[in-house]
């Protein structure tokens, strides 16, 4: 069972949208906190809260009662969204039936105004620049508002939310993010949730889309276009499913009240850097770094995200002084083996870019090809070993007569 009610509270200059969830065995409350100045823009529909909790609902299954008004077109699309995730994660995603107190089916002529999630990283920086400069083609929109959302379940937000010693450093990161947006004349609205306080069976990489889209949906009555910067290139060597933001299930996170634009999914990281190559301030200040505890205003230069960005700069032959950007400005291609497990997709993007443009330095192409070949060999060996091991365990378990004990035996060795 799942039942959702929402109440509103105002306190200390903020407005809280508090979701009360009856989960059957227990009850939870999760809030979204916004500056009180945003109140006039927020919808009274329950659409955002349904999307916010869609993964929670799938984890429980069954009838899900929504004690408010929901767009019929959204519910129609969410049915297909759920079907996607049931196929991708059958052990976690159950069938659900969303039952709203009232379904609204009012066609709306969508305006050209947009709201966007902004993090200060390469994806969102490139997307903001593309739309601001009119470079996004027929999907170019008039961005009116940027949202910075914190309090999620990713590692950086979790530390920023709970660790008092980290909060000051995190504030510096937010200031840096604001400096990038303000360089183009945009302000950032800071939104906080306490989602990190709640439990989930999903990986953050699977469920993050629900948080970011739902918070933007709070503004759906005024800004009919929600812009999400894609973190995944759609090339066949790069695209990963399941993944929170993807070109399949993202299509079902829409209604007749808004259009979701997943911007930049047809671009590699190198293409995105090329897009902002004339925006020097962003090149030197964007937050492409996973290390959040650095005391300086520079990026660490050691994490995999920093290493990938350095690699991209070098692949594009950019004349950038790494001393201005990184605590560790060194660049050595021999270091790139250890992050291949996390960065192999980005290595493939570099090679793809070179096939199209033929401009990446030869030593980079040769080194990345060597690393990827080695990585592929290791993966194939591990897969073969695991397959033979599984066959061996299944063969032994055949002699266990009781099915329940047999399955328990097999699962024990799979752990």
Give the residues covered by each predicted segment.
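N-terminal cap/recognition module
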Residues: 28-57
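Nucleotide-activated chemistry modules centered on ATP-dependent adenylation/adenylyltransferase
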Residues: 1-21, 48, 52, 57-117, ...
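Boundary detector for helix-to-coil junctions that initiate low-complexity/charged tails
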Residues: 377-415
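Glycine-centered tight beta-turn/hairpin loop motif at sheet-sheet or coil-to-beta transitions
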Residues: 23-27
